[in-house]
């Protein structure tokens, strides 16, 4: 029974190595990556994931992103959100835009489990020492609709699952592909999922990105068009869908410049062939982990301003965000494996195929970009 239960909820805190974009020579931009080429290269960052594979219909999960290891409510981080197309249900959006700060872990999941993820964030926040008097929590939860592979109406993710993702969040490598909130997602007709990347700017700052890819258009990798899956034409691959992009940096930015940073993630998204369609939810959340700009009660009482980088220092960070987003999306697709499920109430098998790695290598080589 214990082995069965473990198979139902796979915790992905200690990932194995997977195929990544750089294995194909895909390395957008001039800047180097951090040691892990992941969002967790930003100091203090942690990621936790719970993947749910239940029976032949449940293919979903949750991914937790923690800006720092302390009490996030007591040490809020400045943040900004950019929306390219708003067909989505990003919880917490209005208060982040109004106040320019994030006070909770960020959770990503499927559309119909946003309430459970929010409840987990609220329970986690209220349970933290020092938060005994808290009466308002702005839970930030992003989502994409994984109903193409997952029985989304079953709302399989529990509050306990989401709390476990928060509790299991760790620094270090981040598993990519069909895991966590990316278990049931599809992008460009292929299996999508979780992907991450990072950049180090010449000034010594780090920008890290994590994506949950579940969107459409015509796939482009390193400037090379990639054909749709076998048996499908470009016209039959839906342009709809969504993507959640989380951008973290240790640069001490204001919430206004973090909103600008979030906007630059869309440049990376566009390079991958996104349609930005009517039915797409294209969201980017950006925040700074720099201790000097954290919003604490003591700092609010003692000062009216925080030491932060000026506008003229943002360009390298903007470039880093775009490049890391492009690579994170490529990683989400290249790391994903084939996922199958059954259409609820029928015997119909649903299947999302992975990118054909041999084909990708040939196409890149033909375009003059041979794999490393």
Language-model features: where?
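Alpha/propeptide regions of enzymes that mature by internal proteolysis
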Residues: 17-372
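Bacterial N-terminal signal peptides
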Residues: 5-13
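Positively charged n-region of N-terminal signal peptides that target proteins for export
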Residues: 1-3
